[in-house]
């Protein structure tokens, strides 16, 4: 919440939440204000309102502050004292005095701190003085959370770091071979294709020169992309990749792939290609033709691939609980460890690219995965909105930090039909549009052994069952198709004369 979203005249109607904190502060600044300042700065930002009290029923009451000018002066003196607060991220306009119900209150707008400024903490010890905010209020960050903020504050993404304690032997040669085959298919006659494996890996950022011994060693990105799981966990003890299919509610999962199984390498590259086809199987496919050939790859497929890649390249692999992808009957979910490096609002709006692992993103891009401009959350949303009438949902969790993307496949989409579609009226269409659809039905049947069902036609055009029957009736009347069977089992075949 910011001042633009906040209507001071309606203050008593608000409730404290993850972005609004009220404090009585009648005669002075409460000590807890600095914990809230830290928590908002390290979370999504928020408003602190002084001169307001919350009762036991969580109702807000305006009590006002005495000597607001003195309180504002004390506030600025304290926030600019680095013995009290690590960093002042406010501007003059973010602190203001207002009169409500003939009483004066102070409104302090705390923005989300840029990752380079985090953590923002109280006192001089970041481990003891760093806070974050959730719906229950301010909470003290663990050592693990504070160290994660320091990692993200670095101007250089961590996956470019060279691991001088490892050598070429940590890599799975089969993974490298598979990657190079895909690279060569994408880049015909590329100069890198003639290099040996070690030089090739240096060119793509998987290996680099160590400043410690002046020798070539794997980078973090190279280890994650091509390494064996048992080597990866030496650097990332919490590393874990988990894909689950939950297609039967009576059992925990119907299919599972984990990086720790020992049945395959356990690295990111192999994980992506082990699960991507299973992940996109059964997604609704609309009827589309390109050069009279049916197109089976949709914007929904594109969004799912982007979501999987996003989870893998934005994960903090030092974080807990691993990267977990779940496919169920009606949803797909993608969860990865680590906070977002920009605010959720900024990520959703796009325009700012700040990946946690830029080298990993580059390596996937070199083989055509996630290479499009604007790749990321906005791209996922745009692709999904084009394929459906709703957006994926994104949530940020703390303790531990995780980002969760959920795609709901159960809502009505352009690629499918509503479950109550038989009750929908027949749409009025021009004769040209109807003729075009009838021709598409014939072309579809020619490529489908000459057979089609009413349900397929409804799904093909995203129309009601009644509308689909209407198209088929027109073709029947023209003698172009024949009906076989009755009611639910009825199919339609081409009338070959």
Task: Locate predicted features.
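Conserved N-terminal catalytic/coupling substructures associated with nucleotide/phosphate chemistry
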Residues: 1-301, 306-415, 463, 470
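Short acidic, hydrophobic short linear motifs in intrinsically disordered regions
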Residues: 450-460
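Alpha-helical and His/Cys-centered functional microenvironments
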Residues: 418, 458, 471
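Short amphipathic alpha-helical interface segments
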Residues: 175, 434-451
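Short alpha-helical segments that sit at the start of domains
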Residues: 414-442
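Short, cationic-aromatic polyanion-contact patches
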Residues: 431-438, 453, 486-497
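A short, conserved structural fragment
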Residues: 476-486
